[in-house]
């Protein structure tokens, strides 16, 4: 169905063709490429070698029965909505990606449809409710 895999910074990784993923990360303009599968983009071999976590200090991997991951930079949660779910964005923003099902999100003034593989962002200070039968990935800082 789906897996939650935490890949900490400094971990060399690749994404297989045809794979769908949600990539939650600390905001950064830096991506170091050590191989690019035949694409003609800049490589960063030396810089990559300087930041690789060779000792595996930053533990990552598949998270069985995933419900919540908290890092110093972001939090990711799996939210199962069976009828309704209410929340408040007390700081920054909330992001939801629908991984299964359909529903709607409303702040009392507007309603947005939520469909599989769609993402919605909710700004700070908004009280909102989600209605439907959905599995969501919620991300926030």
Task: Give, region by region, the residue ranges found by the protein language model.
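Conserved hydrophobic/aromatic beta-strand scaffold that supports enzyme active sites
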Residues: 4-6, 12, 21-23, 76-78, ...
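A short glycine-rich, His/Asp/Glu-containing loop-to-beta-strand
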Residues: 58-86
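Active-site lining segments that contact anionic ligands and/or coordinate catalytic metals
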Residues: 71-76, 92-93, 100, 115-117, ...
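Double-stranded beta-helix
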Residues: 22-61, 137-141
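Ligand-binding loop in jelly-roll beta-barrel domains
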Residues: 10-31, 124-141
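Glycine- and acidic-residue-biased ligand/ion/polar-headgroup-sensing regions
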Residues: 81-108
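Short acidic-glycine-tyrosine-enriched beta hairpin
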Residues: 1-6, 107-125
């Amino acid at each position: 169905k789906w897996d939650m895999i935490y890949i900490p910074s400094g971990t060399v990784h690749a994404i297989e063709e045809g794979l769908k993923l949600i990539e939650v990360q600390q905001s950064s303009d830096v991506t170091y490429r050590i191989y690019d599968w035949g694409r003609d983009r800049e490589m960063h071999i030396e810089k990559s070698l300087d930041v690789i976590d060779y000792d595996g200090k930053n533990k990552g991997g598949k998270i069985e029965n995933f419900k919540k991951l908290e890092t110093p930079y972001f939090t990711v949660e799996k939210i199962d909505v069976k009828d309704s779910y209410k929340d408040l964005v007390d700081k920054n923003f909330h992001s939801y990606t629908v991984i299964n099902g359909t529903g709607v999100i409303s702040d009392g003034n507007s309603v947005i449809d939520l469909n599989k593989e769609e993402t919605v962002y909710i700004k700070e200070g908004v009280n909102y409710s989600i209605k439907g039968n959905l599995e969501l990935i919620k991300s926030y800082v």
